[in-house]
Each structure stands twice: as structure tokens, then as C-alpha cells.
């Protein structure tokens, strides 16, 4: 969708901003109704919303500035960030399965990004955005382990509201890389597509991502989330002309295998 919106004139990530605003408009009546009933509306979760929404926005914008495979792999280095955050903030000690996950993830990252140098680093602004997005989103996931909410609605509404604010600020701050704000005509011409993907894709997937850990367990969800790497790598090789070779295949496979091992080898009490 990002590439389609960009081709339709919504450059600079403004397509994502439009989707976020549509989500806010659709969910606002429910938020108001919940507030009148004395229930949580989601507005009282700014920190959580900024972390989850901001991480996702960085991820979405990175696709406009780097290759699909690079964005996927850098964003899904989240096991590294969650391990660091769990040690620092939750005082958890990582087990053997987590260490194996980290080694495989780092190994996969090295294989993909070590074409030019032995010590690879992100090469462009899109790479850095994807890496930062993974770290921010991981912080949001850690936050979800700590807070208690009245169902999934407060989370999804805070994601859209505070994610929109983050997206607008990021759009202006990164205008040198993403380009200026599009014309009104561009928004009008893409309005039907924006509404369609917001209602049938953006909002439902957001609900599933934020709701599923409490229903399916973190282990199964981690495998499902990592499966996006497989889908993304495969689709990018079919739909785009971006680099796709043995490095991308092996590197992404190592990250996915690491996620599976983390679940299979985890102690039963977890």
C-alpha cells in the first residue's frame, strides 16, 4: 500500500498519515461513548500510544526510503531490543533460548548487510528508520506487559491518536528525505483507496496485533509476527525489482528460525 499511495501522489508518508487520521475519525465516536460510560477511552495512554504508534510509523516510512527486505529485517530485530529492555526495566534474566534467538538474529543481520564490509551498519535513512522503529515498537510491547487496560480498544485508539501525532511530526522533520506535503487533489484522488485500506486492513490488523498476545500467548504471536519476514521477502521478489539473492534468503530464514527456537525451547512456565 505504501508504494501504491506514493505512486498516486501521496509522497512523504502522507498516505500513512491519512490512514491514521481516518482511523481516528472512525474510532472517535466509540471513544466518546466509552468515556461517557466511565470506561477507558485510550487518550489516557499517551506514552504507550507513542511507543507502539511511533514504532509502526517508522517501520512504514522506512519502506519509502530503503529496500523491502532491509526494512523487514532491521525492524524485526525486536528480540534484541526486548531482551535489553527486559533486563533493564523488568529485571528479567534471559534464558538459553533467548540467547540462541539473539545469535541467529544477529547472524542473519550480518549476512544480509555484510556485502561491502565485515562490520555492516545501516546504509541509508530508511535503514535507520526501520532499526529505530523496531526498538521503539519493542519498548511499546514491554510497556504492554506492565499496564492493564479495559480491553483492546484503549490500545488501538491510543495507537491511532498518538501515532498520528508522531507521523505528522516525522513527516515534517524528514521532509528533506520524504518530500513536501502533497496537494489536496492527490488526497482526493486516493480517498476511496485510503478509506478502503483503513477500514478493511489498517484497523483490523492493528486490533489483531494488539489483542492477540493476550489470547494466543506471546510465543505463538512471535512466530506469527516473524512470518511477515517470509511473506515480505517472497512478495518483494515477485512484485518489485529490488535486490533478492542468497543473502536475503539465508538472513531472513535465520531470524525466523531464531524466533521459532525461542518458543520451542522456552520453559513451560512461560
Language model features by range: what are they?
Residues 27, 97-115, 247-266:
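Hydrophobic transmembrane alpha-helices of multi-pass small-molecule transport proteins
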Residues 1, 46-61, 65, 111, ...:
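Hydrophobic alpha-helical transmembrane segments of multi-pass membrane transport proteins
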Residues 4-5, 15, 62-63, 71-74, ...:
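Hydrophobic/aromatic residues within transmembrane alpha-helices
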Residues 3-4, 27, 82-83, 119-178:
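Transmembrane alpha-helical segments that form core, pore/gating elements
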Residues 9-13, 38-41, 114-136, 176-197, ...:
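Juxtamembrane helix-entry segments on the extracytoplasmic side of multipass membrane proteins
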Residues 18, 72-77, 144-163, 202-238:
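Helix-helix packing/entry segments at the starts of transmembrane helices
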Residues 20, 226-270:
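C-terminal-most transmembrane helix of multi-pass membrane proteins
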Residues 26, 31-34, 78-103, 230-249:
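C-terminal transmembrane-helix exit sites in multi-pass transporters
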Amino acid at each position: 500500500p505504501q508504494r501504491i499511495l506514493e505512486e498516486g501522489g501521496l509522497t512523504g508518508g502522507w498516505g500513512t498519515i491519512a490512514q491514521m487520521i481516518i482511523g481516528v475519525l472512525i474510532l472517535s465516536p466509540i471513544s466518546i461513548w466509552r468515556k461517557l460510560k466511565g470506561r477507558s477511552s485510550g487518550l489516557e495512554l499517551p506514552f504507550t500510544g507513542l511507543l507502539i504508534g511511533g514504532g509502526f510509523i517508522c517501520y512504514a516510512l522506512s519502506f519509502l526510503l530503503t529496500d523491502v527486505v532491509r526494512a523487514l529485517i532491521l525492524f524485526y530485530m525486536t528480540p534484541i531490543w526486548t531482551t535489553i529492555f527486559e533486563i533493564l526495566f523488568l529485571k528479567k534474566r534471559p534464558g538459553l533460548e533467548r540467547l540462541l534467538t539473539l545469535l541467529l538474529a544477529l547472524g542473519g543481520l550480518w549476512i544480509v548487510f555484510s556485502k561491502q564490509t565485515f562490520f555492516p551498519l545501516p546504509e541509508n535513512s530508511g535503514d535507520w528508520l526501520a532499526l529505530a522503529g523496531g526498538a521503539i515498537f519493542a519498548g511499546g510491547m514491554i510497556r504492554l506487559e506492565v499496564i492493564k487496560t479495559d480491553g483492546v480498544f484503549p490500545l488501538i485508539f491510543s495507537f491511532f491518536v498518538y501515532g498520528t501525532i508522531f507521523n505528522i511530526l516525522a513527516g515534517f522533520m524528514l521532509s528533506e528525505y520524504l518530500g513536501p506535503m502533497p496537494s489536496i487533489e492527490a488526497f482526493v484522488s486516493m480517498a476511496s483507496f485510503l478509506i478502503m485500506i483503513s477500514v478493511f486492513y489498517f484497523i483490523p490488523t492493528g486490533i489483531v496485533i494488539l489483542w492477540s498476545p493476550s489470547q494466543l500467548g506471546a510465543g505463538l504471536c512471535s512466530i506469527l509476527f516473524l512470518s511477515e519476514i517470509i511473506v515480505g521477502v517472497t512478495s518483494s521478489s515477485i512484485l518489485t525489482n529490488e535486490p533478492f539473492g542468497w543473502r536475503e534468503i539465508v538472513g531472513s530464514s535465520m531470524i525466523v528460525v531464531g524466533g521459532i527456537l525461542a518458543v520451542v525451547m522456552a520453559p513451560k512456565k512461560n
